Amino acid sequence: MYTYYIGVGSNLGDREGYLVFAVEQLVCTDSVRSVDHSSWIETPPWGPVEQGPFLNGIIKVVASIEPVAMLETILHIECLAGRQREIHWGPRTLDLDIVWIEDEKGHCVRVEESTLVVPHPYFWDRRFVLEPLEEVYPNFSYEGVSISKRLKTLHGLEVY
């Protein structure tokens, strides 16, 4: 059994509708035991592409599915939502990223595959990931630093 923390975002169309769709699809997945999510927050886009604001959050999923299979599941959900990968860091109907995984004992599960790297390589530098993560996992820490302390460090260092 694994606990997945999945970043979710949308900046096209019915943004909230796409985020809710992702939650609903995960709830209906056979290997999933429970699904919870943070509140949604509006954030400016991250990266070099000019585009509209995002609605972001974190989905917490407890499931028996292995990490690469979970990646396949969320890629399928993105596809069902009409996600098109035309521009790197470009606008999207739905973006799902596995940010963090823990095993049944609460230990970090690290993955280094050609298609999946966990912990997500940029998660610790993105307030739009850390703020909703703190909501669903307030005691989270990484490399000995609490999420609240990290957020204080990031405050003012990045646009968002």
Residue ranges and their predicted role:
Residues 1-32, 37-44:
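N-terminal beta1-alpha1 ligand-phosphate binding loop
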Residues 9, 62-64:
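Solvent-exposed residues in well-ordered beta-strands and their adjoining turns
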Residues 38, 46-54, 65-72, 76-160:
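Flexible, gly/pro- and Lys/Arg-enriched active-site loops
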